[in-house]
C-alpha cells in the first residue's frame, strides 16, 4: 500500500497551510513575485515560519523588521544582493544568510550532490523532520523548491518528493509541486516534474536542510 510522509509541523486550517509551531499568524505559503529571482529566500522564509522562528507577518513585512533581530540581520544581509535577487541565489548565499542570522537556533546540513545522491539526502532529512531546500535545474529552468514530504510506493520505495514551490499556486494542501524520483529518463534531466499538462524534465542539484537545535 502507498504511504505518505510529511513534516509533522504542518497542518491545514481555515483553507490555508499552517505551522503548528506558532499559535497565530502561522500561514506558511509565500508567493514569489513574477519579476524577482528570490525563490531561494522565499523558501528560507517558509522554512523559518514552519519552524516557528518567524511568523507570516514578519515575512511579508520584511523591510520593516528591526535590524538588531535575527530576521533583521538576514534582511540586512539580503540587501547586499539587491532587493529582488534578480540574478537568483546560490547554495552558498543561502547558507551565508542563515549563518549570519539564525545560526544559534538552527542545525544546517548542506549537500552539493545531485541526482540520486541528493534525493537520498533529501529523504533522510525529511525523515528527521527537517524541511529541505532543493535546487531544480532544467533546460530553461533554475529554481529552488522546499521539500516537505515524500510518497512510498507499494514496495516501500520512495517514488515522489513533495514540495512547496514559491512560484506556484497557493492552495489548501500540504504541497503544490511533485517530482517523480523513482522512474528515471535518459538525458541530463532524468526526473519528471509532474504538475504540468506535459511533464517537465529536471535534475536535482544542491540542497540544504534546516532543523531546530
Question: What does each model-found stretch correspond to?
Answer:
Residues 1-77:
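Active-site nucleophile-adjacent alpha helix/oxyanion-hole segment immediately C-terminal to the catalytic cysteine
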Residues 21-22, 80-121, 127:
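Cysteine-dependent deubiquitinase/ubiquitin-like isopeptidase catalytic cores across multiple families
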Residues 34, 38, 89, 117, ...:
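Short, well-structured alpha-helical interface segments that form or flank functional binding sites
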Residues 41-44, 92, 139, 153:
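Short, electropositive, low-hydrophobicity segments enriched in small/polar residues
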Residues 52, 99, 103, 205-206, ...:
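Generic short alpha-helical segment signal, independent of protein family or function
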Residues 55-56, 106, 155:
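Secondary-structure boundary/capping signal
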Residues 110-164:
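Active-site-adjacent substructure of cysteine-protease-like catalytic cores
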Residues 150-213:
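Noncatalytic regulatory segments and standalone regulatory/sensor domains
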Amino acid at each position: 500500500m502507498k504511504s505518505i510522509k510529511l513534516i509533522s509541523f504542518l497542518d491545514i486550517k481555515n483553507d490555508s497551510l499552517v505551522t503548528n509551531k506558532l499559535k497565530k499568524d502561522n500561514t506558511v505559503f509565500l508567493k514569489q513575485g513574477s519579476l524577482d529571482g528570490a525563490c531561494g529566500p522565499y523558501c528560507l522564509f517558509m522554512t523559518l515560519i514552519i519552524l516557528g522562528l518567524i511568523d507570516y507577518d514578519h515575512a511579508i513585512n520584511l523591510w520593516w523588521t528591526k535590524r538588531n533581530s535575527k530576521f533583521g540581520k538576514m534582511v540586512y544581509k539580503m540587501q547586499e544582493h539587491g532587493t529582488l535577487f534578480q540574478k537568483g541565489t546560490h547554495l552558498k548565499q543561502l547558507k551565508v544568510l542563515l549563518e549570519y542570522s539564525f545560526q544559534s537556533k538552527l542545525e544546517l546540513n548542506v549537500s552539493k550532490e545531485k541526482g540520486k545522491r541528493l534525493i537520498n539526502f533529501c529523504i533522510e532529512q525529511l525523515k528527521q523532520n527537517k524541511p529541505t531546500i532543493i535546487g531544480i535545474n532544467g533546460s530553461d529552468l533554475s529554481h529552488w523548491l522546499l521539500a516537505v514530504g515524500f510518497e512510498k510506493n507499494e514496495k516501500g520505495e520512495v517514488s515522489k518528493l513533495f514540495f512547496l514551490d514559491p512560484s506556484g499556486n497557493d492552495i489548501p494542501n500540504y504541497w503544490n509541486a511533485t517530482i517523480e524520483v523513482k522512474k528515471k529518463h535518459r538525458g541530463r534531466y532524468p526526473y519528471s516534474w509532474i504538475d504540468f499538462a506535459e511533464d517537465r524534465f529536471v535534475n536535482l542539484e544542491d540542497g540544504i536542510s534546516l532543523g531546530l537545535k
